[in-house]
Structures are given as structure tokens and as C-alpha cells.
Regions:
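Alpha-helical residues within the helix-turn-helix
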Residues: 23-24, 41, 62
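Hydrophobic residues on short alpha-helical segments
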Residues: 6-13, 58, 65
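Alpha-helical linker/hinge and terminal dimerization helices associated
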Residues: 42-43, 64-81
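The N-cap/first-turn positions of alpha helices
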Residues: 2-5, 29, 61
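A short LG(V/I)-centered, amphipathic sequence patch enriched
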Residues: 40-57
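Helix-turn-helix DNA-binding elements, focusing on the entry/boundary residues of the two helices
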Residues: 17-18, 36, 50
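Short helix-boundary/capping micro-motifs
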Residues: 10-26
Length: 81
């Protein structure tokens, strides 16, 4: 599982928006969208429901979001040390 894609997914959920996540990550909106799609393809599950009002997690997305939170926290701690 690609941590860059996982970070894009995590940030999108936290921002409730792909475009807001893209700004925060200094990426383009299509780039973030593509990373999330690749993550979904890698694990064979849809993670997000996309709408004009934002994004919401699917049941698989809820599980992966918790996993992402743990993995990204570990990665951040490793980079600090």
C-alpha cells in the first residue's frame, strides 16, 4: 500500500474535499483524485462516496481511514527521530 496515496486519502477525509486536500498537499485536484482511485484499485474497495457537498466514507473507507491514521502517525514519528 502506497503511503503517498494513503496520505492523500486521509487528508481528503479530514478536509471533506478533494480540492481542499489538494491545496493542503500542494497537489492538483486531479492528482489527488487519481491517487485515491489508485488506492481503491490496489485494495479492490471503494473508499469514498463523492458528492457536490464533499466526501463520505464507505464502510471499507472507515476501516482504511483508521489504518491510515495509525500508519501516517508512525511515519511522522519515524521522520522526527
Amino acid at each position: 500500500m502506497n503511503l503517498t496515496y494513503l496520505r492523500s486519502f486521509y487528508t481528503t477525509v479530514k478536509c471533506n474535499s478533494i480540492s481542499k486536500a489538494a491545496k493542503q498537499l500542494h497537489l492538483t485536484q486531479p492528482g489527488v483524485s487519481m491517487q485515491i482511485q489508485k488506492l481503491e484499485n490496489d485494495i479492490n474497495f471503494k473508499l469514498l462516496n463523492r458528492s457536490n457537498t464533499g466526501v463520505s466514507l464507505t464502510s471499507a473507507g472507515e476501516i482504511i481511514f483508521e489504518f491510515a491514521e495509525s500508519m501516517l502517525s508512525i511515519e511522522d514519528n519515524l521522520q522526527k527521530n
